[in-house]
Amino acid sequence: MTLVNAETNNIPFSSGEPGHFYYHQWSPENPKAWLHIMHGMSEHGARYREFAKFLSSKGIMVTAGDHRGHGITGQSMKSSYHIADNNGWEQLLDDQRELIKHIHSNHQLPLILLGHSMGSFLAMHFCQKYNSALSNQNAPQISGLILSGSNYGSPSTWRAALIIAQFERWRKGFDHSSTLLEKMSFGAFNNAFKPARTESDWISRDHKVVDNYISDPHCGGPLTTQSWCDFLTGMIELTNLTALAKINSKLPTLLFSGQMDPVSNAGEGVTKLRDTLTKSGMGNVAMHLYPGARHEA
């Protein structure tokens, strides 16, 4: 297949705020579908380049934005690793809605969402809020949902974590990071891979992927305490059964993860997520665990 404008990086998208949002796009000739990626915490959309180029060669257009506080967007807004001063999670959701509407205005294609790690929660929450409403806002219906490297925690678990994050926000300041929160969130992830080659071995079994992550200035930085508070508030809203039941029950959904992913406790969390989505009423949920794979399967 001949590729036309196969890769366009750092496309500015005005938000009406200081700085710009930026997204990346991989476009084949005559695309038959559109995959939109919501990336994870402390990374950025351009990391999905090789995956996107592969899909583009198969006729699928791929887009991936850099969230607030992340990648070129965070750099442009002078807020790297700080999502917002308040209501950051809601702003991430609204950003995705506006970006999808913007891209759809030029490409009327079936839309599949792929969310990785934090982005998987963002994609689920997006489907709760906007799946039925998008068609009334000059945007596409969502045709499929893919969740990578995800997990499940009960609302009570997230509430307990939020109390600690709020204390750290009071102690450190809203726009500062917290070593305690970082250790609580990521500190044990490498334990299963000792003796570890790096502190980021849990990311992938592919040494090149890990090394690129470590050397990338837009990866691995600690979020601010306010960003943690906003994220955890979003998790509380997302994970109760009443909220999950708002996702289109017929939406085809695929969960995949590494069988050794510490984020989901070696697949336990993503299995719980599948069961919870099914219990909430979703009738078309599949799951696959990749043997030997880690967080980025």
For each feature predicted by the language model, list its residue ranges.
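Active-site glycine-rich loops that stabilize anionic/oxyanionic intermediates
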Residues: 32, 39-43, 117-118, 259-260
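Gly/Ala-rich beta-loop-alpha elbow adjacent to hydrolase catalytic centers
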Residues: 115-119, 123
